[in-house]
Structures are given as C-alpha cells and as structure tokens.
C-alpha cells in the first residue's frame, strides 16, 4: 500500500509540512532500527470520524518504548491529543495513522542512551491492506522458512521497527513463491503469526489462536476479535497450534489493524475448509464492522470521535 502525502505531520510537538518531516542520515534509527511504532485506523461512520482503540494503541506504544529503554518526552494523553490533532489538521475522514518513536541524531553504537528520543505522528488515506476483495474471497498463505524470533533474542511484545526485518524476509519469500501472505512458526515449530498479522483458525465452531508465548505481537485487533467472539457465545482457545491443524481447519483468518479480519482460503496450496470465507469468520467481520460503522452500540468503548 502506497503512502500518499496528506499535508502535515506532527513532529516533536509541532505541525510541519509533510516534506519537511525528515531525519538526519546519521540518526541512530537509520543504522540500528531503533524505533517503536503503532498502526491505527480512523473510520468514517454515521456519527462522524472515529479512531479505533486509540488509547490501547498508545499504551502499547509506551510499553514498546519502555521495553527498549526509550523515554517518550510526552504523556500518553498528549500523544492521544497529537494523533487527533494530526487527523484533523489533514482533513481526513478515514485514514491510517502512524505514531513512531525513534532514537535520533546523537551517538552511534549499541549503547544509545544519550541519543535524543524523537516522536512523530503521520496520517494518510488507506485502503484494504491485502486487497479490496480479500475481506470476502480470502488470501493464499504459505508457511515461511523464516521463523519468529525467540523471546530471549528479540522482545516480540514490542512493536519495534527492527523486528520487522524478520517480517520482511517472510513476506518477500511468500510473494516470490506466489502467495499473498506468509505464516511464521515460533522457535518451537508451532504457528506464531503472519508477517504483520495475528492468525486464527476455526474447528467445529470453536476458535483457536496461538498464545502470546508463541513469539507474537499482542495484537489489538486480535484482542477485539476474541472479545467479540466471546460476546457472541463462540468459544476461543489460546493454545499452541501445529502446522497441520491449519490444513484441516474449517476456517482460518488473519487479524490486524491494516488487515482487519481477512479470511485465509489456502495454506501451502491446501484449501482451507470450503476455500472461501466461512460462517464464523463472516460473523466476526460483521460484528467488527457494525461497531466501526456505528450500526450497533459501542459497548466496549472502542471508538474515539474526532
């Protein structure tokens, strides 16, 4: 998905022109991947424009920064305000929002405590991450030869820029082999997640998803789906999942801020269930989008109107 210029970016407390939101080539982040970030969606509905789970995203941003010893020079509330301000300033009704915290220009090396911590918020128009038709017809995925990092090598609970080099390898491999997306295993050989999404399967009407201990990011859309499913009376199991369990599942789907709830129609060329979006996946999609579109009560308090 391309990143189209939308006007202004919030950078270290000030609104600057899109083209002026730059960093020095010797900034620490450029050389060592020392950034943490979030991906957040703003949706247009009958009541206005609403940011989905804003505070949960900002809390995770601060948690990621804490893991990497990065002291954000703003409060969570100030970052929430900056995100709302950025969307308003750019006149966007529906968009993708990217707050990012990074170590800037200061010192080189792997002990970066004296580097400044910079913060930026950008927002731009955004479509369906895995394709406009993917939400209905699904995507083809392949299990990657690249594994998710063990938790004692890289902290997967941090949404850190450097972690996504691992994801890039898996995604490029998947596309090269003719798949839309990759599925990655954890260091024990169990299913972990996609290159940028969490994963679920459905078997005999019940939902299964890997536990957080399977080297995955604790996804906010993942949490939303679990809450919706349980509210709808669907049993959800968080437990290790083997590769072959995907092959014999009735349904499977990815979740993520960008991917939303995207069905998986095949894995490694093996058709999942009927090879199309299944009834449980559709139920979850319908309830998810009903909340976003203000077609039902926001009983979870997930929408922040701007």
UniProtKB/Swiss-Prot annotation:
GO cellular component: cytosol
Keyword Amino-acid biosynthesis: yes
UniProt cross-references to Pfam families, sorted A to Z: Aminotran_4 (PF01063)
GO MF annotation list: L-isoleucine-2-oxoglutarate transaminase activity; L-leucine-2-oxoglutarate transaminase activity; L-valine-2-oxoglutarate transaminase activity
UniProt-listed Enzyme Commission number(s): 2.6.1.42
Pathway participation: Amino-acid biosynthesis; L-isoleucine biosynthesis; L-isoleucine from 2-oxobutanoate: step 4/4; Amino-acid biosynthesis; L-leucine biosynthesis; L-leucine from 3-methyl-2-oxobutanoate: step 4/4; Amino-acid biosynthesis; L-valine biosynthesis; L-valine from pyruvate: step 4/4
Residue stretches in coiled coil: none
InterPro entries from the UniProt entry: Aminotrans_IV (IPR001544), Aminotrans_IV_CS (IPR018300), Aminotransferase-like (IPR036038), B_amino_transI (IPR005785), BCAT-like_C (IPR043132), BCAT-like_N (IPR043131), BCAT_family (IPR033939), Class-IV_PLP-Dep_Aminotrnsfr (IPR050571)
Family the entry assigns: Belongs to the class-IV pyridoxal-phosphate-dependent aminotransferase family.
Function: Acts on leucine, isoleucine and valine.
Protein name listed in UniProt: Putative branched-chain-amino-acid aminotransferase
Organism whose genome encodes this protein: Methanothermobacter thermautotrophicus (strain ATCC 29096 / DSM 1053 / JCM 10044 / NBRC 100330 / Delta H) (Methanobacterium thermoautotrophicum)
UniProt lineage: Archaea, Methanobacteriati, Methanobacteriota, Methanomada group, Methanobacteria
């Amino acid at each position: 998905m391309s990143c189209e210029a939308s006007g202004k970016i919030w950078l270290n407390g000030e609104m600057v022109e899109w083209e002026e939101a730059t960093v020095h080539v010797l900034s620490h982040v450029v050389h060592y991947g020392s950034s943490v970030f979030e991906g957040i969606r703003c949706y247009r509905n009958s009541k206005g424009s609403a940011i989905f789970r804003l505070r949960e995203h900002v809390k995770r941003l601060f948690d990621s920064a804490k893991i990497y010893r990065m002291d954000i020079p703003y409060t969570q509330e100030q970052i929430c305000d900056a995100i709302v301000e950025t969307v308003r300033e750019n006149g966007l009704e529906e968009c993708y929002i990217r707050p990012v915290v990074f170590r800037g220009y200061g010192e080189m090396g792997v002990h970066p405590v004296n580097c400044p911590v910079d913060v930026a918020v950008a927002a731009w128009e955004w479509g369906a991450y895995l394709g406009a038709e993917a939400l209905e017809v699904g995507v083809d995925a392949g299990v990657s030869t690249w594994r998710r990092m063990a938790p004692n090598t890289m902290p997967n609970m941090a949404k850190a820029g450097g972690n996504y080099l691992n994801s890039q390898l898996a995604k490029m491999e998947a596309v090269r082999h003719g798949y839309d997306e990759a599925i990655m295993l954890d260091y024990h050989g169990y299913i972990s997640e996609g290159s940028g999404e969490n994963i679920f399967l459905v078997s005999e009407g019940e939902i299964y998803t890997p536990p957080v201990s399977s080297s995955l990011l604790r996804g906010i859309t993942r949490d939303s789906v679990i809450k919706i499913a349980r509210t709808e009376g669907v049993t959800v199991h968080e437990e290790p999942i083997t590769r072959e369990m995907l092959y014999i599942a009735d349904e499977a789907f990815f979740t993520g801020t960008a991917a939303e709830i995207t069905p998986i129609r095949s894995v490694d060329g093996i058709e999942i269930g009927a090879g199309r979006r299944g009834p449980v996946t559709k139920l979850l999609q319908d309830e998810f989008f009903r909340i976003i579109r203000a077609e039902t009560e926001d009983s979870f308090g997930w929408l922040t109107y701007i």
